[in-house]
């Protein structure tokens, strides 16, 4: 089984984009959506979005194809503080082709390590990506 697990590399320009994204100064929500180029076996940029809420973000995700998302979220704490956690979200909808799911699942950890992220979440249905869901997930870290 392990020999069929494909681990894709991360495109060089995407590595640089993720590094810059980590240190961005803007105070709005933003997302980098990534996909796998299966011929090149590379994780590549799909879209970059600024000023996007979790609910708007879910509308950008394909319902039948996996995607990786790095999301900078303006998190308002109960005590009034504001932070901007970087979240990694693996969208792996039910109904994806099994080989596609395997390729994404096999490449997820490498991408998380490359992007140096600790807040890693997974959704199986794009409808699950809501502000409430994200706040609940982030609540475990704060």
From Swiss-Prot:
The keyword tRNA-binding does not apply. The keyword Nucleus does not apply. Phosphorylated; stimulated by phorbol ester. The modification N-acetylserine is found at residue 2. Gene3D superfamilies: Severin (3.40.20.10). GO terms for cellular component: cortical actin cytoskeleton. Keywords: Acetylation, Growth factor, Phosphoprotein. GO terms for biological process: actin filament debranching; learning; locomotory behavior; negative regulation of Arp2/3 complex-mediated actin nucleation; nervous system development; protein phosphorylation. PROSITE patterns: ADF_H (PS51263). It holds the Pfam family Cofilin_ADF. Residues 4-139 form the ADF-H domain. CDD domains: ADF_GMF-beta_like. SUPFAM superfamilies: Actin depolymerizing proteins (SSF55753). InterPro entries: ADF-H (IPR002108), ADF-H/Gelsolin-like_dom_sf (IPR029006), GMF (IPR011171). One of its GO terms (molecular function) is growth factor activity. This protein causes differentiation of brain cells, stimulation of neural regeneration, and inhibition of proliferation of tumor cells. Belongs to the actin-binding proteins ADF family. GMF subfamily. PANTHER family: GLIA MATURATION FACTOR BETA, GLIAL FACTOR NATURATION FACTOR. This is Glia maturation factor beta. The gene is GMFB.
